[in-house]
Amino acid sequence: MSLVRLAHELPIEAPRTAWLDSIIKGDCVAALERLPDHSVDVIFADPPYNLQLGGDLHRPDQSMVSAVDDHWDQFESFQAYDAFTRAWLMACRRVLKPNGTIWVIGSYHNIFRVGSQLQDLGFWLLNDVIWRKTNPMPNFRGRRFQNAHETLIWASRDQKGKGYTFNYEAMKAANDDVQMRSDWLFPICTGSERLKDENGDKVHPTQKPEALLARIMMASSKPGDVILDPFFGSGTTGAVAKRLGRHFVGIEREQSYIDAATARIDAVEPLGKAELTVMTGKRAEPRVAFTSVLEAGLLRPGTVLCDERRRFAAIVRADGTLAANGEAGSIHRIGAKVQGFDACNGWTFWHYEENGALKPIDALRKVIRDQMAVAGA
């Protein structure tokens, strides 16, 4: 089955089955009208940079530098570029889920104008991320600093966009248990990853490295999420999404790019479920009520709980509360009360005895969560 859908053949707000895991051929704003409201989880946008190039650029050996001079990167004025930017961002905001996020990448030529439009339209900026290139192109004329980075803006749909995905624990673990910083070091796309045509020329002038897209998706999405790329180009977003178990929808108007992206995505082998399991922190784990521990038979009413040093004790009641010193309440309230504190995490404070050893009741909560995970698999 072909990946390609023609924008004008899709109905307005087409059903998910009509566009999921496909490339929609057409203008990005018109094509976005074909997607329903709140239908995508993450957007990655690599829009035209509106490069202000003044003539040809040559290396010291007089060979010409292959720069971005395609017609799709040409705008009559900054005002025209701003109008274009506002139009596609408005269309993207409509299809983004309330808890979704958008990534936009750009250079110094355009990223500040894009950032201003994002804020004006109600997006809420979460981070700017610097992609530092290990192998940037030199500044051949020697009139400026070497431009060795691009900037990504990461934003939620609006200020109240709570519940967006950020796989903090996974990013930290992947970074040797140190918080992932907002400056990322990757080489530009070269070697076998760089798509070439039959003449050995680059298929796309600004092909992004798969490692960059992989980090974005691993940080801000989950397996099964829908990733939209309104400027699909050579299909890096689709290829990485397929490999990482995400769905994608790309929008592209240039047939040569569509052909290259289609062949590229068709060749991708998705990773298995075990490789795609995302490490999560406690905040992302399902809530478990203490009464569930009793209902599962892991503790019985009348069991005496204590702290790890056996200074305080409480009795488990049949209704899932604890009783101590004439007071009754939740595991958290009674834990705080016996210590004279304002708050307490009862799961880690209270312990039960098993084979002569004290264990935190949090271990029983883990048993319940494991059962929930199996039931939901």
Curated annotation (Swiss-Prot):
It catalyses: a 2'-deoxyadenosine in DNA + S-adenosyl-L-methionine = an N(6)-methyl-2'-deoxyadenosine in DNA + S-adenosyl-L-homocysteine + H(+). It holds the Pfam family N6_N4_Mtase. CcrM-mediated methylation has important cellular functions. Contributes to the accurate cell-cycle control of DNA replication and cellular morphology. GO terms for biological process: DNA replication; methylation. GO terms for molecular function: DNA binding; N-methyltransferase activity; site-specific DNA-methyltransferase (adenine-specific) activity. GO terms for cellular component: cytoplasm. Gene3D superfamilies: Vaccinia Virus protein VP39. This is DNA methyltransferase CcrM. Belongs to the N(4)/N(6)-methyltransferase family. Its EC number is 2.1.1.72. It is an enzyme of class 2 (transferase). Residues 271-373 form the RAMA domain.
